[in-house]
Amino acid sequence: MSIVVARLAGGLGNQMFQYAKGYAESVERNSSLKLDLRGYKNYTLHGGFRLDKLNIDNTFVMSKKEMCIFPNFIVRAINKFPKLSLCSKRFESEQYSKKINGSMKGSVEFIGFWQNERYFLEHKEKLREIFTPININLDAKELSDVIRCTNSVSVHIRRGDYVSNVEALKIHGLCTERYYIDSIRYLKERFNNLVFFVFSDDIEWCKKYKNEIFSRSDDVKFIEGNTQEVDMWLMSNAKYHIIANSSFSWWGAWLKNYDLGITIAPTPWFEREELNSFDPCPEKWVRIEK
């Protein structure tokens, strides 16, 4: 039987895109799926490898022996950012492409980012099940009930390396306070009794600048003390979403359980203009200047 390998890199959101692409390909090719984790040996950013915290069978992870043998007989498909050279045989696409379907026979390894829902949209329900955290404590379950039962808005504010790392800031840029103010206004003009649940990798900053973003009459709750997987799961239970330009943010909204909800995303997604052909947001999402 042929094998589909998804090489993982980056934080949780990126890992989920890479897994979703590999999963969809493995189902469509009737192949077994393996995860290549070689990049995590010395990788500690963003919590390192995180998919083992989700409802994913760990037998999918390649052994050291498999990683040594596999590259000798595969064709690699690469979906990459410009000027990022990864290997000699490439499948390059700056935008969504299905060119590889049917054109690659046998075993294949997918290396890259694959940040477009069309690669795996038809598997959404299964992915929602797979991407559920395996450890959700009672407090988080009770909070999820509150989120589901209110006119809830998940607000994700990404700071972290977007603030501390100059190169990351040049690539991604940072969502401004004005973006959040405009997004909140957009929802308040359409819905009543909104409750804002704020998620962030810098929750203290959010608390400090609450009055710069929210009005005094807004019902705002700051969510903290959870793992990132549980935070994402809680976000997915909200009716409406205001996301940052972050793959973590993207998944919190895309996995939502309320199909009638609105998702607001920043534009442009990247600070570097040439990267915006990689914009991952579905067309139906509302876009507001970041």
Curated annotation (Swiss-Prot):
- pH sensitivity of activity: Optimum pH is 7.5-9.0. Exhibits 60% activity at a higher basic condition (pH 10.2).
EC number(s) per entry: 2.4.1.341
CDD domains in the record, alphabetically? Fut1_Fut2_like
Q: Look up keyword Transferase and say if it applies.
A: yes
Q: Organism source for this protein? A: Escherichia coli
**UniProt similarity note:** Belongs to the glycosyltransferase 11 family.
Q: What gene makes this protein?
A: wbgN
**Keywords of the record:** Glycosyltransferase, Lipopolysaccharide biosynthesis, Transferase
Is this entry keyworded tRNA processing?
A: no
Q: What is this protein called?
A: Alpha-1,2-colitosyltransferase
Please describe what this protein does: Involved in the biosynthesis of the lipopolysaccharide (LPS) O-antigen region. Catalyzes the transfer of colitose from GDP-colitose to the galactose residue of beta-Gal-(1->3)-GlcNAc (lacto-N-biose) via an alpha1,2-linkage. Is specific for beta-Gal-(1->3)-GlcNAc, but can use GDP-L-fucose as the sugar donor with almost the same efficiency as GDP-L-colitose.
Record field: catalytic activity:
GDP-beta-L-colitose + beta-D-galactosyl-(1->3)-N-acetyl-D-glucosamine = alpha-L-colitosyl-(1->2)-beta-D-galactosyl-(1->3)-N-acetyl-D-glucosamine + GDP + H(+)
Q: Name one GO biological process term.
A: O antigen biosynthetic process
GO-annotated molecular function: galactoside 2-alpha-L-fucosyltransferase activity
Regulation of its function: Addition of metal ions dramatically decreases the activity to 0-40%.
The GO cellular component terms are: membrane
Q: How is the cofactor bound?
A: Does not require a metal cofactor.
Q: Which pathway does this polypeptide act in?
A: Bacterial outer membrane biogenesis; LPS O-antigen biosynthesis
The EC category is transferase
